[in-house]
Curated annotation (Swiss-Prot):
A biological process term (GO) from this entry: CDP-diacylglycerol biosynthetic process
Pathway(s) it belongs to: Phospholipid metabolism; CDP-diacylglycerol biosynthesis; CDP-diacylglycerol from sn-glycerol 3-phosphate: step 1/3
UniProt keywords, alphabetically: Acyltransferase, Cell inner membrane, Cell membrane, Lipid biosynthesis, Lipid metabolism, Membrane, Phospholipid biosynthesis, Phospholipid metabolism, Transferase
Biased composition (Low complexity): 20-29
Species whose genome carries this gene: Xanthomonas campestris pv. campestris (strain ATCC 33913 / DSM 3586 / NCPPB 528 / LMG 568 / P 25)
Record protein name field: Glycerol-3-phosphate acyltransferase
PANTHER family: DIHYDROXYACETONE PHOSPHATE ACYLTRANSFERASE, GLYCEROL-3-PHOSPHATE ACYLTRANSFERASE
Catalytic activity: sn-glycerol 3-phosphate + an acyl-CoA = a 1-acyl-sn-glycero-3-phosphate + CoA
Organismal lineage: Bacteria, Pseudomonadati, Pseudomonadota, Gammaproteobacteria, Lysobacterales
Membrane topology: Peripheral membrane protein
Length: 886
């Protein structure tokens, strides 16, 4: 198991220290903050301790020590503790009491040549016949997974030691804090039980501690801290009670920081977070309002708020996360041919000092598990994950909750109390420095495209930061790419009109054996370029001075900032795409009428796609499979995606039926990477010749709509440059010819059915249906006239026209009649003022829309345009009631 950091800090770089209290002085200085670095980094300077005491250890300690020795193997930090030669007595300080801790400490001292903690100091100032004390007592509970840490207790021994210093002026005991971690990160070979009983934040009972020592004692870490002089501490002149409280606080802060550095922050705080949420002013006001609205008692509204908070809150458990990691390793090895991670090192460079919000693409339920697993395996504490309430199933929901998931309802509109509780819970997570993960798309994509983002969680995160701007927030886009989806068949059913099946525990259990028998290929997780929230705020709110904003203040720049963040997240996810073998096969095979190609043609088409990606890189974070076209074909056959039909004139490779529909999902994953090349190729589908200037003009015209649909990163000028680069490459490849230099150059494609024409047509096919959708919307608008249709009516009529066109003309991909794509196109028309609403919310337009429609002849064939115009419906006319005859 790799070393785990509480946040993704680079090795050797410290997190910003948290304050230890208002007082300062020799005591605070004696315990420097523990930097969250990997455990193999240099440890703090060794305490130099007194020679071993002459008195023998108690007989029971010698007996139990011999019994425990075979089960213990210690890693002592620092490696070579020295000796303290001025004769000052030493008392060790542990975080909590326990026989196992005493025996481990005694063994560590013997191995390091230090004084035994089980032999009392001269005069026994502790009055306990020993030389160690602890700040807390273990809970007597022997539950295997306790939900809460036991309560802290007042250290009587420390009070007695301080009192002894007041009585004896010659006494100067040095306190040496010692942190003990049993099984901090056991090897996977140790077994599931070893992972379950490894070190965590809970104070556990004797039985659990015994199992922990037996299973994980051979991976025990003992860390000594520099000593504290009690005489110097008392020299500060504070009152006795205040000295005791300060010393205990500093020691607890030290132990907490060491524990955070070794096992990550304490995330098992469900009850604490719920209490903090319910105590917040905004929630208390919402409770009072709810009671008035329901005409009920305040306590009833409070109970409702408590139920909401308890339904939402995560219940992070380190043992469960470790156990899940152990189990998932075997699952991934069984169903996937590897999980690759790219650019995580860049996140580790950018993350120090930031609150990290992970915003991945969402294409499978596996996304939840994969990202958390990969972060944990690479030494980063998994984030708190926003999950839909539909996943809060019996047993499964509990496990997800203990893995860091918190559950939210799909719709919170009209429920002010729930909204207040959820907003406050997110605010508490952000203020507490916990990393968060959510899917801005809201749900899983059924088409393979990134969905239009929803800004609800982004707005909550932004408001939480503005309320308490402690640590700057970093949004981390993540692209997760699959070669085969577990949910493929259910997506297929939904896309053909069948209602989405409700998740159930029995459905999950029934699917497990089938899933484990499948080969789902390789998974790639790419980390995109992070987005600093402060950079977005600097653009949208330059007047904000960094001071906290009250909850009731709603600045006008908040909504535009949320929209910008949402679009940037989707754009940067696309900029970190991975192109896998199935993506390339889908691009090639779905461009043919029967979704089949000869093997030589398929190899040539894949080579062309890879060359386009190599010569015109989309971004420096896009990754492309290194496999050759021949190996790609073999791999697709291995995972049962591709069918080979032998033939004397050459083998034919094809996909058919449901597989072809599912392949459109993987084509859509990478459609944005080929936008410029597909645009140029589309223009030559129905045109033998075109001018370079005409290509650029039309490209600038259509680009805003492509940008909104595919989350493209370029300006219009930059897109025009990519069109120029694409043209030059097509000329070099022989796909286009420079005929004359008129009008910036006249370009022509080859005549006949040459290989070059075939490859050009295949490249252009992927964007063809997008332009058909655009023309459907324009045709429906023009046919009905200005001031007739509202935006919602236009969406419905466009969807009906697209469905009919698919039935009459040619089968289309499922997203062809997706209403949300029409909605996005209509919204972009409104933004560009090509259409606008009148006083009755009906869409108006002028002759510019007619000109836009005329340009369609350069892209769509005459027959297709005519068919679209014929199937474009008109809005139903209201019945005209004839006036009664006189």
């Amino acid at each position: 198991m790799p070393e785990q950091n509480p946040l993704p800090f680079p090795d050797g770089q410290s997190a910003p220290p948290s304050p230890a209290g208002a007082e300062t002085g020799a005591t605070a200085a004696a315990l420097p903050p523990a930097a969250p670095v990997a455990l193999d980094a240099p440890a703090p300077a060794a305490p130099v301790l007194a020679p071993a005491r002459v008195a023998k250890r108690p007989w029971w300690a010698r007996l139990l020590g011999r019994l425990a020795d075979p089960w213990l193997s210690l890693t002592i930090e620092p490696e070579q503790p020295g000796r303290y030669d001025d004769g000052k007595p030493v008392v060790y300080v542990l975080e909590d009491y326990g026989l196992s801790n005493a025996l481990i400490l005694d063994k560590a001292c013997r191995e390091a040549g230090l004084p035994s903690p089980l032999v009392p100091l001269p005069g026994d100032p502790l009055e306990r016949k020993r030389a160690y004390l602890a700040l807390s007592r273990r809970s007597s509970s022997n539950s295997l997974i306790p939900e809460q840490r036991g309560g802290k207790t007042h250290s009587d021994s420390l009070a007695k030691l301080l009192q002894a210093h007041r009585v004896r002026a010659d006494l100067d005991v040095h306190l040496v804090p010692v942190s003990i971690f049993v099984g901090r990160a056991p090897d996977k070979q140790s077994g599931w039980f070893a992972v379950l009983f490894s070190e965590n934040w809970a104070l556990v009972g004797r039985f659990r501690r015994l199992l922990s020592v037996l299973l994980n004692g051979r991976t025990t870490i003992v860390r000594f801290a520099p000593p504290i002089s009690l005489r110097q501490t008392m020299a500060e002149g504070l009152p006795p009670e205040r000295t005791l409280r300060k010393l205990q606080r500093v020691l607890r802060t030290h132990f907490r920081r060491i524990r955070e550095a070794v096992i990550g922050p304490d995330l098992s705080t469900r009850r604490l977070l719920v209490d903090q949420v319910l105590a917040a002013d905004s929630v208390r006001e919402a409770i009072a309002t709810q009671a008035k609205r329901d005409n009920s008692k305040p306590v009833d509204a409070w109970r409702k708020a408590h139920a909401y908070a308890w339904e939402i809150a995560a219940d992070y458990s380190s043992p469960v996360v470790r156990s899940a990691s152990f189990l998932l390793t075997h699952v991934w090895n069984r169903i996937y041919a590897g999980v690759l991670v790219h650019h995580l090192d860049k996140l580790k460079q950018a993350a120090p000092g930031h609150e990290v919000v992970y915003v991945p693409s969402h294409r499978s339920h596996m996304d939840y598990l994969l990202l958390s697993y990969l972060l944990y395996e690479r030494g980063i504490v998994p984030p708190h994950i926003v999950a839909g309430i539909n996943l809060n199933l019996p047993v499964v929901g509990t496990l997800l909750r203990k893995g860091g998931a918190f559950f939210i309802r799909r719709s919170i509109r009209g429920n002010a109390l729930y909204s207040a509780v959820l907003s406050e819970y997110v605010a508490q997570l952000v203020a507490g420095g916990y990393s968060i993960e959510y899917f801005v798309e809201g749900g899983r994509s059924r088409t393979g495209r990134l969905l239009q983002p929803k800004g609800g969680m982004i707005a909550m995160t932004l408001r939480a930061y503005l309320r308490q701007p402690r640590k700057p927030v970093l949004f981390q886009p993540v692209y997760i790419g699959y070669e085969k989806l577990m949910e493929g068949n259910s997506y297929l059913d939904e896309l053909t009109g069948r209602p989405k099946e409700k998740e159930s525990i029995w459905g999950l259990l029934w699917s497990i054996p089938k899933v484990l028998k499948q080969n789902y290929g390789q998974v790639v997780v790419n980390f995109g370029e992070p987005i600093a929230l402060n950079d977005v705020l600097a653009k949208h709110a330059p007047e904000w001075n960094g001071e906290p904003l009250p909850d009731d203040e709603k600045p006008t720049w908040l909504a535009p900032a949320v929209d910008t963040l949402a679009t940037q997240i989707q754009t940067r996810i696309n900029c970190a795409a991975d192109v896998n073998p199935i993506n390339l096969l889908a691009l090639a095979l779905l461009s043919t009428p029967k979704h089949a190609m000869g093997e030589a043609d398929l190899i040539a088409q894949i080579e062309l796609c890879k060359k386009l990606l190599a010569e015109m890189p989309y971004s420096d974070r896009v990754t492309v499979t290194p496999h050759t076209p021949a190996r790609i074909i073999t791999h697709a056959e291995e995972i049962n995606v591709l069918t080979r039909v032998s033939h004397p004139l050459g083998d034919v490779l094809s996909v058919s039926g449901d597989t072809a529909v599912l392949l459109s999902y993987f084509r859509n994953n990478v459609l944005h990477l080929f936008t410029a090349s597909s645009w140029v190729a589309c223009c030559f589908q129905n045109n033998r010749r075109m001018s370079r200037a005409g290509l650029l003009r039309l490209g600038r015209t259509v680009y805003p709509f492509l940008q909104a649909e595919l989350f493209l990163p370029w300006s219009e000028d930059r897109f025009a440059e990519r069109i120029e680069q694409t043209i030059d490459m097509f000329v070099r490849e022989g796909l286009l010819l420079n005929v004359t230099d008129d009008d910036g150059g006249i370009l022509a494609r080859n005549t006949g059915q040459t290989d070059e024409v075939f490859r050009l047509r295949a490249i252009g096919h992927s964007l063809q249906q997008a332009f058909e959708r655009y023309y459907i919307a324009i045709s429906v608008l023009v046919k009905n006239g200005p001031g007739v249709l509202g935006a919602g009516e236009l969406e419905s009529l466009c969807q009906q026209a697209a469905q009919r066109l698919s039935l009459l003309y040619a089968p289309a991909a499922p997203e062809f009649f997706d209403k949300t794509l029409f909605r996005s196109f209509i919204q972009k028309l409104r933004e560009l003022r090509l259409v606008w609403p009148d006083e009755n919310s009906k869409l108006m337009f002028d002759e510019r829309l007619d000109a836009w429609a005329k340009d369609a002849k350069f892209i769509l064939g005459r027959e297709l345009r005519h068919t679209i115009e014929r199937v474009s419906p008109e809005a139903a006319k209201p019945d005209v009631v004839s006036p009664p005859a006189e």
